[in-house]
């Protein structure tokens, strides 16, 4: 059970609708003529036919139309969920529509629901069942841990009707993947006084006991022994010392390892370069990259994917006090390069500098880092698309394809040599902030300086996608878990 839904796949038969109190019909325009083949109850089929004949906007993606119909078994709620038309009839539309439907079912206090879609009459379209299942689980997410009188929706048993033989397996996969995204969301939505670097350690260790993951933790003593002065500098002003966490998963024998490295700044005040107080509380989400990696490793291990992956969480809290790093300080990262601290609020790239270096020491032959790195990415790409800076176009295409399967959008920015010049310092090797111009690019290129030469590397900036300001589709206001599903899908492609 996930988010009050108990979901199973079932064949398309008239008997499947018996005893249900709700039916959700997922419709794209091209598939609408096949509605009679769904063996809906007679009253429902007539209502659908009449409504479709009179309304053209029913197919708009995410649009919901609800009826309460009298039937022989009593009152029944019918929800028609629009999924697009023409070439726009993609799995992600069904995922979004299912997210909307999940909240409608919760609101109606549904107990027994059936989800049907003409497109699932095609035995080759099981992946649409997976998309619908993901949407139901993600759209039904709630975070009410701190509500004194939290109200849970009743448990709703859902049958997802499909003629595809692989639907049952894909629905199981969807539940594991969605649980991982919700795990990420929970971490992100908790406040900074709850989630600290040590709490991230405890979450990783708990996963290591439950799943085939080898967990290694570097505390401040071990970080110093390994020369990781960049992450230590970021955490110096906090009473919660930094931690570097590694989770190793071996599902492919001697195959090379890919590393996912996440920024885990559990609260970012900006340090001495302190942020404005407006919305500073939102900086509890500055550990989303690390949460993404932890959630992805959870699903990868649960699914038993045939790949070798190392997850690295570079965790620290960025606070101002008498011991905190100062603008103008120069620190030496683990790979020996020196960093001039222009702004203590450009701390994410510093923890990742040691994080990607550590991933290389653990044997990674491909490195992907993910971080709420900049506000500049919001100006460049908005809140629906994450930016990529990379040294390998093949890896970028893999990420984009994984994102397509996950319903998450990415755009590559140019890693020009001129931009790399911008991160050079007059008094040290590198600047931790090169100013406003090309901020997404220069931030990414800074991190790339700490990846072993010749290794494929990509940086993902989720600064604009890590949280949602409103609930729509699969997104629920708060932490989105953007990136978790992409990393899982990518691991399945390795």
Predicted regions and their residues:
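Short amphipathic alpha-helical segment within the helicase RecA-like ATPase core
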Residues: 1-264
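A generic structural signal for tightly packed, nonpolar segments enriched in small/aliphatic residues
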Residues: 1-2, 59, 200-494
């Amino acid at each position: 059970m996930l988010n009050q839904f108990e979901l199973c796949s079932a064949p398309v038969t008239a008997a499947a609708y018996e005893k249900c109190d709700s039916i959700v019909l997922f419709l794209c325009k091209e598939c609408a003529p096949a509605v009679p083949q769904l063996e809906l109850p007679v009253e429902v089929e007539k209502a659908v036919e009449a409504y479709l004949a009179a309304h053209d906007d029913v197919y708009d993606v995410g649009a919901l139309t609800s009826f309460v119909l009298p039937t022989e078994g009593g009152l029944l709620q019918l929800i028609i969920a629009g999924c697009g038309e023409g070439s726009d009839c993609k799995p992600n539309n069904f995922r979004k529509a299912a997210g909307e439907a999940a909240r409608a079912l919760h609101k109606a206090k549904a107990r027994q629901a059936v989800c049907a879609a003409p497109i699932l009459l095609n035995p080759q379209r099981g992946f649409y069942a997976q998309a619908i299942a993901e949407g139901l689980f993600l759209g039904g997410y709630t975070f009410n841990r701190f509500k004194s009188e939290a109200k849970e929706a009743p448990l709703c048993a859902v049958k997802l009707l499909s003629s595809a033989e692989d639907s049952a397996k894909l629905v199981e996969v969807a539940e594991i993947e969605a649980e991982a995204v919700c795990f990420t969301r929970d971490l992100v939505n908790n406040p900074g006084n709850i989630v600290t670097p040590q709490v991230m350690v405890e979450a990783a260790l708990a996963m290591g006991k439950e799943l085939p993951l080898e967990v290694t933790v570097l505390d401040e003593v071990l970080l110093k022994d390994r020369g990781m002065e960049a992450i230590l500098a970021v955490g110096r002003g906090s009473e919660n010392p930094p931690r570097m966490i590694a989770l190793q998963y071996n599902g492919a024998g001697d195959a090379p390892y890919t590393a996912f490295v996440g920024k885990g700044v559990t609260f970012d005040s900006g340090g001495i370069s302190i942020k404005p107080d407006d919305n500073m509380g939102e900086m509890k989400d500055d550990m989303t990259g690390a949460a993404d990696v932890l959630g992805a490793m959870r699903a990868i291990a649960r699914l038993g994917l045939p790949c070798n992956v190392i997850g690295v969480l570079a965790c620290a809290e960025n606070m101002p006090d008498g011991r905190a790093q100062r603008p103008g300080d120069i620190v030496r990262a683990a790979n020996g390069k020196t960093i001039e601290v222009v702004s203590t609020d450009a701390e994410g790239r510093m923890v990742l500098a040691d994080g990607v270096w550590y991933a290389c020491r653990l044997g990674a032959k491909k490195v992907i880092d993910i971080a709420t790195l900049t506000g500049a990415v919001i100006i460049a790409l908005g809140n629906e698309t994450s930016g990529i800076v990379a040294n390998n176009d093949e890896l970028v295409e893999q990420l984009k394809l994984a994102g397509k399967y996950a319903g998450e959008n990415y755009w590559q920015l140019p890693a020009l040599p001129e931009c790399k010049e911008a991160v050079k310092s007059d008094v040290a090797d590198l600047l931790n902030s090169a100013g406003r111009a090309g901020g997404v690019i220069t931030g990414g290129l800074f991190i790339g300086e700490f990846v072993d030469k010749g290794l494929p590397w990509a940086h993902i900036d989720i600064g604009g996608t890590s949280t949602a300001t409103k609930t729509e589709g699969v997104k629920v206001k708060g932490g989105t878990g953007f990136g978790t599903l992409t990393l899982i899908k990518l691991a399945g492609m390795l």
